[in-house]
């Protein structure tokens, strides 16, 4: 046997028990690309196998224990190196000793709490992953496998429309209305704009969907605004009494649910920004926050009962009967 057991090393592979049947979804990585990951919901069990393959047959691998962890953590990019863990579960797979041959270890994390949605933003990343580690004297051997978590909501009981009047005194007076204040990610924003007074020459009007990511607290707060969509309402001059309909489909845009004060580290909010431009290129705008949520087609046949029970309800809504949840819905 070589000194300190350096002559032997190993490869680790993590395989989920339901890897062949579990759904995969695309998720943005830190470099802006997209990869596919296994999808989980709050309350679902995470189980599988850790395969340890010795690279050099006939040589033993000394170790100080083998373990697997399930971790949920938040990383703020301006504070790299400090990972804020909000879920940390550990299973010991083997006590300190030696491995004389390749070996497979089973693991199971039962009904795991996954309170937040996976998110990769401009200044923050929230991720869930499994990490298997062979502890050694000087250099541990480890392998990570990321998963994606999505949070589900039922229909909010209170979902009032948005009605506002905006304008410039004696020049412009507009009344606009959106049919709801809370929309699921594949919803349609329906509304109208009514011109009560028009004494300036408007040449263009649009609605923008603005995503605002806020990270940090106190003096160290960072805001990142990103225009997700631009929807042209009109190109030309409106007249008094004119009413313009709005119909904006959200399904074609890449958005997440609204995330408020996640673990006291960050928020993601969405706004409808009504923009008017006059012939002198002056811009007038009015912003209104909306809430986005992931529609819980809560009981699809492919979804486990435990995930159904754990599916998150929209905050502030009252629990609905289980029978109501059991209706299959299509996006």
Curated annotation (Swiss-Prot):
Keywords for this protein: Cytoplasm, Endosome, Membrane, Protein transport, Transport
Record flagged with keyword Nucleus: no
Main location: cytoplasm
GO cellular component labels: cytosol; endosome; retromer complex
Cellular localisation: Cytoplasm; Membrane; Endosome
UniProt xrefs under Gene3D superfamilies: 2.60.40.640
InterPro entries: Arrestin-like_C, Vps26-related
Pfam families tied to this protein: Vps26 (PF03643)
Keyword Transport annotated: yes
Membrane topology designation: Peripheral membrane protein
Gene Ontology biological-process entries: intracellular protein transport; retrograde transport, endosome to Golgi
Role description: Acts as a component of the retromer cargo-selective complex (CSC). The CSC is believed to be the core functional component of retromer or respective retromer complex variants acting to prevent missorting of selected transmembrane cargo proteins into the lysosomal degradation pathway. Retromer mediates retrograde transport of cargo proteins from endosomes to the trans-Golgi network (TGN).
The protein's assembly and partners: Component of the heterotrimeric retromer cargo-selective complex (CSC) which is believed to associate with variable sorting nexins to form functionally distinct retromer complex variants.
Name the UniProt record assigns to this protein: Vacuolar protein sorting-associated protein 26B
Species for this entry: Danio rerio (Zebrafish)
Taxonomy of the source species: Eukaryota, Metazoa, Chordata, Craniata, Vertebrata
